[in-house]
Regions:
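Active-site rim beta-loop-alpha module in soluble metabolic enzymes
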Residues: 105-155
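Flexible, glycine/charged-enriched surface loops at secondary-structure junctions
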Residues: 15-21, 123-130, 219-226
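Metabolite-binding pocket within alpha/beta catalytic cores that recognizes anionic/polar moieties
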Residues: 1-114
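His/Asp/Glu-rich mid-to-C-terminal helical/loop segments that flank catalytic regions of hydrolases
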Residues: 189-226
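Generic non-transmembrane alpha-helical segments
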Residues: 114-122, 171, 211-222
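Zn-dependent metallopeptidase/amidohydrolase metal-coordination segment
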Residues: 166-200
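Short acidic/polar active-site loop segments enriched in Thr and Asp
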Residues: 62-63, 159, 178
């Protein structure tokens, strides 16, 4: 998502460099603990994610982890919470161009497993659960704005709202690529990006970056041993 976050990820690499910054995509590559990785800032929403996936895969990528931010719905959730996605309610449109709405948007199990394992090894608290992803940031029917929609997602136990994971999971499934996602909460169920929570959010963002890098490293090493 955020271009600044892609740079933060790249800063953890030993020899990162800017590959390109064009048409809204900021792309960095480098090595993390000896493993070659790429960090790509895609902007907001499903269409830009789908394009990034297609073009990065054309260059050889086959495993994708979204490191993002999200809103939350459930009582007790707060800024900085780390959420590892087990699936996504499909409220966007881009994924429908690949597979029908009945097809579930879920991460690859091996990626999910390594993200959970990384969080536990790093002693980073986390939540796992299903979220919702849609295209309309200011849509009047969004759960944050429509009481009926909000009650539905609360009752369903959904733990996050963002704009990209439905596309990530469905496009990945269509092509046979491995995918996963985790987010740092940027608010509470009643406050969107409160000023008092900014420091906690930045801590959670850094936690997500660490978990993603450790998880990707584990996947790459397992591939090398296979």
């Amino acid at each position: 998502g955020d271009h600044a976050r892609a740079k933060k990820i790249a800063d953890h690499m030993d020899d990162s460099y800017l590959v390109t910054d064009s048409r809204g995509y900021a792309v960095y590559s480098g090595h993390y603990d000896g493993v070659f990785m790429t960090a790509c800032g895609t902007g907001m929403g499903g269409p830009t994610v789908a394009i990034a996936l297609e073009e990065l895969a054309h260059l050889g990528a086959d495993t994708f982890i979204r490191v993002g931010s999200c809103g939350v719905f459930q009582e007790g959730q707060k800024p900085g919470d780390v959420i590892i996605a087990t699936g996504t309610f499909r409220a966007g449109g881009t994924a429908n161009a690949y597979l029908p709405p009945e097809f579930p948007a879920v991460p690859t199990f091996t990626v999910l497993r390594e993200l959970v394992r990384a969080a536990e090894e790093l002693a980073i608290p986390y939540t796992v659960g299903v979220g919702i992803a849609g295209d309309a940031f200011y849509g009047p029917r969004k759960p944050q704005r429509d009481p009926q929609s909000r009650q539905m997602v609360v009752d369903a136990g959904l733990v996050s709202v963002e704009m990209e994971s439905d596309t990530l999971f469905v496009v990945g499934a269509y092509h046979g690529w491995r995918t996963g996602a985790l987010y740092a909460s940027d608010g509470t169920p009643t406050e969107i990006k409160p000023e008092w929570g900014e420091e906690d959010f930045r801590r959670g963002e850094e936690d997500c970056i660490q978990v993603a890098l450790h998880g990707m490293r584990a996947l790459a090493r397992a591939d090398g041993a296979a």
